[in-house]
């Protein structure tokens, strides 16, 4: 059996008084150290842990990646594959698939695991839904994932823009199945508004990532709330019983097997149908360190545990991401493409 790789990382919590002051200009990205160094969570003396053999990524040859990037730039579109430095970008792009990120490239949150830029976002681009729909139709995609940055500056958290994108895609590519990966719509009245808006044109799959176990939220997802995310998933399912719900969790941030199992049970108790489980990889030295690399055997054990809980589909493996092979996951859960 493969031996787990583990170590302890010191975490230093910096108060708001001593954290670097924020200087935000609309549309300007804060990335890497500029982003994390202004967060209330800092990481001290955390050397990079050597990646085990099962984390290696094969980079395919050919021009497919550059061709798809050119198509995206032509239509002024952004993919989370690029913005979040996803390790599967070459495989997905070489197969002509992508997860589109709407509502800009600047997020209002500073999650310590995420490589998407922080800052003050620009207003939503009213032409984006049409551009997205045109690209989806031109690429002949059978299944598309649409996600976004957090937009705490918007009263509906960006829900109307999601609906506009769904409607535009269905008009241009009616056979395309649509999965949305949404933020948490956290804030007074925001979840209510978002769910009401999404009900006007719901997706084929509703995905919202729980990301980590509740004990790690203060260091990993500052600004988010574990129970809020569970409630969002459950409320959407209650409104749309026939639409598949989905969530995802990262491993390697300091969680235990027992904590992960509890989180999986919580997700099932809140009527989540599908789950993705994958290894966290540190985007830059400024981000949350990798506490350990979970082994392939452990991912297999979690897959079996999730299946026993009654998830309709469990994708569990070191390189699994929430939208990686999303079409296959949806097909496994009965969502026809």
From Swiss-Prot:
SUPFAM superfamilies: Radical SAM enzymes
GO MF terms, alphabetically ordered: 4 iron, 4 sulfur cluster binding; lipoate synthase activity; metal ion binding
Any matching Pfam family: Radical_SAM
Signal sequence, start to end: none
Organism domain of life: Bacteria
Domain named Radical SAM core: residues: 93-312
Subcellular location: Cytoplasm
Assigned EC number: 2.8.1.8
Binding site for [4Fe-4S] cluster 2: 107, 111, 114
Binding site for [4Fe-4S] cluster 1: 81, 86, 92, 323
Name by which UniProt lists this protein: Lipoyl synthase
Species annotation: Xanthomonas campestris pv. campestris (strain ATCC 33913 / DSM 3586 / NCPPB 528 / LMG 568 / P 25)
Record lineage: Bacteria, Pseudomonadati, Pseudomonadota, Gammaproteobacteria, Lysobacterales
Gene name of the encoded protein: lipA
